[in-house]
A protein has these predicted regions:
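Specific aromatic-rich, kink-prone transmembrane helix
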Residues: 476-496, 511, 525-528, 716-720
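Transmembrane-helix motifs of polytopic, lipid-linked glycan transferases
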Residues: 408-440, 483-487
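Hydrophobic, aromatic-rich transmembrane alpha-helices
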Residues: 13-23, 628-678
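Perimembrane helix-loop-helix junctions
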Residues: 524-568
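Transmembrane-helix signature of polytopic, membrane-embedded enzymes
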Residues: 30-42, 427-459, 479, 496-503, ...
């Protein structure tokens, strides 16, 4: 009966879809059968609903009928829209027909691929059997069998074995009906068997991990040969205070169909996004003709990114918000620096262990451990006092004012989130300003696609995914660089039009503030100084107005003052702060860190530079059948020596953001420019988007590889590549090459979303913390796992 119902549903859906697609193709016969198609669609819906309320016995196919009815209804609706608008909107009809075809293909994938296990028992002679808990040999561990309710309760970490002898029947599926204890997150089930091919035990033949509130984790398929003889089920719990109550163990129960509209929606969005960039008339229109659409699209993209950042931080928020914002404790940045500044000193108030003062070399981690000397980890130790290497900008702009106002310490995770959100918003604003000034004629799809790739590959995701105190400096620096870039770009210093000195000053201020967040970001200040000097020749000039030499000179002096004073003042603050701590204005103090290595004696090795360059730029992702399907291995390039690698790693940016490959076309772009512009843009892009990011990557040779550093350089690298690619697109008249460029962007957008999501997810939920978030982990894994 199950096969008959399945065939009826499939034939009915096939008929409805044939009519719908025939109608979109302007065939005559579908119009004659239209009402019958509506009736068949209604039947599929009614069959599913009556099964849900137990009026009909659909043999577990209720969801199957409802799914077919929904898919058919969607495609019929699209066919009706196409029939109404086909004479006026040819391009829209093509997009709708493609969407309908994509929905049909995705529905087939749902039915045949993602529900592959539901057909498992259809391929053999299997009989559903409940394995009794009363007639089974139970060994080992702490267990209690309740004969009245016929259920078994297991407690603690000890392994409990249930052995069923002389089963003598094939086993195609295993279902464990069990309730996990209140604090129990998982239970492992392992099955050893004997079958017709092996009279002794085959160990670990079936493996399951039962998860709480995840019913689909309680059944699995079994690929066994012939009849099973002995069937031994082993239960193991991870903690001593865990428990599980086993109510039923059933073999050969049908695995139910499970259809996910969310999964279909994700795939549909990615496919339509790529297709639309290539073929959609709307997305092929120039940005200047669709300003409102581009802004709205950018706003939606930014809002989604902000929600993603919030969700990553929220996943680790397990206390009431009020309690989090009333913290009495903090870390080196949120509390120790705050207390020190309030006390009017630059050294931290933390007491130094006398044993540390007495050590010959306190910077040797192994020596401190061997002598059992207490030391503050990742603090700077100089002249008998503790200091902080980390930037003071977040302290004076957020943590200190908050403590002065409330008497509490601002929470780290929400500080990282706040700076991350500011950075995400201003990254979009910077990108839109970049388009408005240089690429107004670029197609909307290319423009929005570039924004998606840039936001997805910006690196800020790894920062908000793990909110330790290290990430405060990264996130605040990311925000300041994005804000500074926005004001510098909108000052018209790089483009035509009157230069806005106040905006240039704000750009200078925030870029300098970035250095007070993270000293490494000083490289962007150097680039900004060069750019400001390059704009000096245009300073004070107005179109059609000729100024006297003296007035022009005074305006240029004022221009330089606007650009230099904010940066100079903050540089003086940083230099004074360095001198007050380490007796030298140029000493940031990192070599005095009590950390993984003795930086006072570490030596430079060129090979360590190559490790960073390879892993950040070139490391290829690998595919695996385990969700989220892509991962990248960190490699030290077989270079001998101690090189620190933090938890987590990502693929090279050339894979995460495919448009970075546009740098290979830089020569073609430069040939189209006159000599003056060729030199100008070589300096601007080469310095800001290539050289300075490479300097940052090379500078981490001493501190080692950490995934969070990608937020320092990823988006500047990408925006330079996009500038090259967009320029070539606008200046080529070959429509074939333009289409190839749109296809490349159509591929780059889904690729960036998939690869970056996979690496961020793996970083956020590595194996050793997955069970802490078992609900999220299992739900996402279930969503995309086939077997």
């Amino acid at each position: 009966m199950t096969y008959i119902l399945f065939a009826i549903g499939l034939l009915g859906a096939g008929f409805v879809l044939s009519c719908a697609f025939g109608s979109m193709a302007e065939k005559k016969w579908p119009q004659q059968l239209q009402k019958i198609a509506y009736g068949v669609n209604g039947y599929l819906l009614l069959q599913g609903l009556l099964g849900k309320v137990h009026v009909l016995d659909n043999r577990g196919l209720d969801g199957y009928f409802l799914f077919l009815a929904f898919v058919c209804a969607c495609i019929v609706l699209l066919s009706l829209i196409v029939r109404r608008i086909r004479s006026k909107y040819v391009s829209s009809c093509r997009m709708l027909r493609f969407a309908a075809g994509t929905i049909a293909v995705l529905a087939a994938a749902e039915l045949l691929v993602f529900n592959f296990n539901a057909y498992h028992l259809w391929m053999g002679d299997y009989t559903e059997t409940r394995l009794s808990l009363s007639n089974v040999k139970i060994e080992n561990g702490d267990f209690v069998y309740d004969r009245g309710q016929d259920q078994l309760t297991i407690r603690g970490k000890g392994e409990v074995l249930l052995t069923y002898e002389n089963l003598n029947q094939p086993v195609g599926t295993l279902t464990v009906d069990a309730i996990l204890g209140e604090r129990t997150k998982s239970a492992d089930v392992i099955v050893d068997i004997t079958d017709e091919t092996h009279q002794e035990y085959r160990y670990n033949t079936v493996n399951m991990r039962l998860l709480k509130d995840a019913p689909r984790s309680h059944f699995t398929t079994c690929e066994l040969s012939g009849k099973v003889g002995t069937f031994r089920v082993k239960f193991t719990l991870p903690e001593d205070n865990d428990s599980i109550t086993v109510r039923n163990i059933v073999i050969n129960r049908d695995i139910p169909f499970h259809f996910s509209l969310l999964r279909m929606g994700v795939f549909l969005t990615l496919i339509l996004l790529g297709y639309g960039i290539v073929h959609s008339t709307l997305l092929r229109r120039p940005c200047y003709r669709e300003k409102l659409f581009v802004r709205a699209g950018a706003a939606v993209i930014t809002a989604v990114c902000c929600m993603g950042c919030v969700s990553l931080v929220w996943a680790d928020t397990n206390r009431p918000i009020k309690e989090i914002f009333e913290r009495e404790q903090g870390n080196q940045i949120t509390r120790e620096l705050v207390d020190a500044f309030e006390a009017g000193q630059v050294s931290l108030k933390t007491t130094v262990d006398p044993a540390l003062l007495a050590m010959e070399n306190p910077y040797d981690w192994s020596a401190r451990s061997a002598e059992n000397v207490s030391a503050q980890w990742d603090h700077v130790f100089y002249n008998g006092k503790y200091y902080s290497y980390y930037g003071i900008a977040p302290v004076v702009t957020l943590f200190l004012p908050y403590h002065l106002l409330t008497g509490k310490y601002f929470p780290t995770q929400f500080a990282v989130l706040l700076y991350g959100l500011i950075g995400v918003v201003f990254l979009t604003l910077t990108y839109l300003a970049f388009l408005r000034r240089f690429h107004r004629s670029l197609p909307c799809g290319m423009a929005l696609g570039g924004l998606i790739v840039m936001q997805a590959s910006s690196g800020i995701w790894y920062v908000v995914a793990r909110t330790l105190f290290y990430e405060i400096s990264i996130a605040s620096g990311f925000a300041c660089v994005a804000v500074g870039a926005y004001f510098l770009l909108t000052s018209n210093i790089l483009s035509h039009g009157r230069i806005s000195c106040p905006r240039m000053a704000l750009g200078s201020l925030f870029l300098a503030l970035a250095v007070l967040c993270r000293p490494t970001l000083a490289v962007y200040c150097i680039a900004a100084v060069v750019i400001i000097l390059m704009g000096l020749s245009r300073a004070g000039k107005r179109p059609g107005v000729k100024l006297a030499a003296g007035k022009l000179r005074s305006r240029r002096i004022a221009y330089l003052a606007w650009g230099a004073v904010p940066m100079f003042l903050l540089a003086c603050v940083q230099l004074w702060y360095n001198y007050a701590r380490f007796d030298s204005p140029l000493d940031f103090g990192i070599q005095y860190s009590l950390t993984i290595n003795d930086f006072t004696r570490s030596q430079f090795h060129l090979g360590f530079v190559f490790i960073g360059l390879y892993n950040y730029l070139l490391a290829p992702p690998k595919f695996t059948w385990t969700f989220p399907f892509f991962f990248t291995e960190f490699t030290n390039l077989n270079i001998n020596g101690y090189y620190f690698s933090d938890v987590g790693n990502t693929a090279g940016i050339i894979y995460l953001a495919l448009p970075v490959l546009c740098y290979l076309l830089a020569g073609k772009a430069l040939k189209r420019l006159n000599k003056r512009d060729r030199i100008r843009w070589s300096i601007i892009i080469g310095l800001t988007c290539v050289l300075m990011p490479l300097v940052i990557i090379c500078s981490i040779w001493e501190s080692g590889y950490a995934i969070r550093y990608t937020a320092d350089f990823s988006w500047p690298i990408l925006i330079g590549a996009l500038a090259i690619g967009f320029y070539l697109y606008r200046h080529t008249k070959n429509q074939t090459w333009r289409k190839v460029a749109r296809i490349c962007m159509g591929i780059a957008v889904p690729a960036a979303l998939v690869l970056n999501f996979a690496h961020v997810y793996t970083f956020k939920f590595p194996d050793w913390v997955a069970l802490e978030h078992y609900g999220v982990f299992n739900s996402l894994a279930e969503l995309f796992t086939i077997f």
